[in-house]
């Protein structure tokens, strides 16, 4: 750290500001490709004191401490105030090629007091371009050097010869006075002196550039140079004390030896120029003075002065940078100490040969000096062969006591470098390797810094200091303008600094402060949480643009400008992103997967922007064990690297295979999608063809209507055969039973809700159809005319009350489709009411020869009359309910539903509907949701119905169905089989593959009531049923029964048509009705008893929140019927789906948490 006394105390003045601009613009190197000019200086304080304007873009970096740029126009003045005590000056240049007004700002110096700087048009409207800058930033080091030399800036520069970071502090200039335009030269001598100084500076800069251009671009030798410096530094420390004893012996030969070693050093430079910049300058001066025949004693004095200056500068070197270098050197030294002992001994013997060869090349040296020089070097070599101490001292802090030792060390340095480079075949990647490679190759990619290390008990401290340096690793924080503003105002969890730690953390409170000499920032984290701990694991090679440890925003400059032109004030542009495509290819070729600390999963740009960093599996609480694990992993790092070198080839192969597989999968998916689209198109074409065929059939049916009517009239007159009479009686019995079933449902449509809400059919719930909402079927013939080769069965709950029969005279039936029993899951559907609208389709698999006999003249007549009665409904389909004008209100939901039906062509009339498997094209529940649905928190005991009652009722129904079917004629044996199959064990066959014409595949795959996977109902235990259905459900029958309790008087057409041949059938129906009414009364009593016994058990379930859906249904006859469906909100969620003709309520069961 720099002491307060040694820090430059510069008070900025207007003249200093002007002078700095002029000196930068007067630099020698000029580039025509860039039209950039210096604009102004910024004075910056701490981050908390920084206020960012709204229309600015932030540029972040550590090598260039960059401020938000301010867009300035002509005749505009901007005053920037930073109240912090610690401030620094930054200057920038304006790039005219970038139309957004991008301003890159560089750190200049540190100030002790705050300062207000006025920016005027004089500084903006500068026609001369800024010299020393180029697109690829090759002359950026020149710019920084000029700042250091002219403005006494405390900047870090990278010495390419030794690959070390050096703090160069030239002698400070006299402090400018605070008032502007006071120091102005009046005499011509002063002006001439100033011009001479400028010329000298320009010459020195040109020499440095020429020397830098001749340097080779070496990446693999970075770590070797560090090791060699460390070894030589240790040797110097051991040999200093012994060298002091030899000073008297060497005094008379010092001058000649200085010349020898300098020439040997020059000879090594011709082979591989890696001298520091100061030594290169001294060597150039030495060559000039030799040509002028100057004495070597003056050269010695000049060299001593330069060494003293270097020692002073090394004192001011940043302590933090020293610690970093020491850690790196210690780590490298431990790994290579044993391997380099033998090569070092061989290398130390080589300097004996060079001094012998040098005097022959130099005519100035005398042959008498050679035998004296040899024993001195032998003694020094013996001293250097002693074991080196573990502690390594920085080469910049060494006190060079003797020039002979320094020269010998230089020779040893060069020899060691050559031998080590020849002996070492493997590249070891250490912290900071990428930065060294980038800087040694003059890459414009500047690091943003990373955390150095954390002590073991650092998490126990309240404040953890994390140092960001420019020679460790990378950290990229992608933020927006709003997040920066929030961070500066609130200091809350805005950024996620997980990249710093090698693990994912969340910083809750932090502050960022610059160090005393502004060479680094200190990130003080007050609160943080370790979300995840990362462990070392090899990962596949990835390009630098996608690697999580390296900057992710690597764009070409052209692309960056195009993107930034549309997003002024919102984007954040980094100076690191200005990289060419060629340099990007070089970076991609580096082995980035061998970094010391790694993140197992790659982070995309979206993850960085959104902060989605919780992608790893294991979690951590920030205990000290984590840091112990890190130390153990660092010990095993050498073994890791060796293993990874062998695995890299395999990993590359695996990576290529993975890419090929991924590409093949993508192609397969594309092919599959195309095939699906083709199939869908074919299906649509087939459907269109079927519709056209149906329309043609309807037209043919209408043309043949008159012929059929004439035939039926003739058949009515022919009653000669007794067989026809028997068939008529049998058919009448079946038809009356069918009418009776339909009319039973017509008697009270509420019963189907009660039956479906309960846990009926011994644990199986039938997905029933409330056809009251949609269909009107007056007779079997009308129904069979509507459905082609199909009939639908009903699952209804009926009541023998006269009130229900009178009120529901306009509603005829509800239908339910039946298909395979295999498709029915247990707990199929519980407690929710819904409707299924069946469309035409299907086939009769159980047709008998008796079916032709079942078609009587009366049936044909009735089918004719039904056709004429429903001519308006022929062209409509059964695919959806037409929804008209929903009325939202605070009252229960009311909707008006109009029904439509179709009358496709009939090929033959099936004898038994249960043998049919109709195809379902759509279903829907389409009530209107109110804006504020009414919730019923409690229900009375009368509103509850026991599950056991429903089960008992259905069991009784199953028994009645079997007995009644057995009482039918023997020629209907197939009907008995079908009935037994359907109601055996109270398991009806139900079509569960319902699909809607408007629904998508995603809806069918979800947990909507569209398939086999239907949710379980809480009503098994809750038993929430509407109170209107409490008594009505007690007298129930199901399909396939000959129950006559629901016959209406509206079937006069049917009775009148059968007046000749169906009198006996009506008598039988009345008798059967009386018997069934008796059985229903008995069942009523049993059910009432069960209700009384179980009502007490239902008291605990009365407080469930229930959403009541109310429907207002309109049948084809114009009768309105209201119905309410209760749904438990605690277990179900209701949503609506807009569809053609209305919308649909989708009820989903909530998952148990």
Swiss-Prot record:
Residues 164-193, 224-245, 294-316, 332-427, 613-648, 683-703, 717-740, 772-819, 838-874, 942-1106 are annotated as: Disordered. Residues 687-699, 772-784, 856-874, 1064-1081 have a biased composition (Basic and acidic residues). This is Putative uncharacterized protein DDB_G0290989. Residues 169-179 have a biased composition (Pro residues). Residues 613-625, 988-998, 1005-1015 have a biased composition (Polar residues). One of its GO terms (biological process) is positive regulation of transcription by RNA polymerase II. GO terms for cellular component: mediator complex. It comes from Dictyostelium discoideum (Social amoeba). Residues 231-240, 298-312, 336-391, 399-423, 721-734, 788-808, 839-854, 942-987, 1019-1059, 1082-1105 have a biased composition (Low complexity). GO terms for molecular function: transcription coactivator activity.
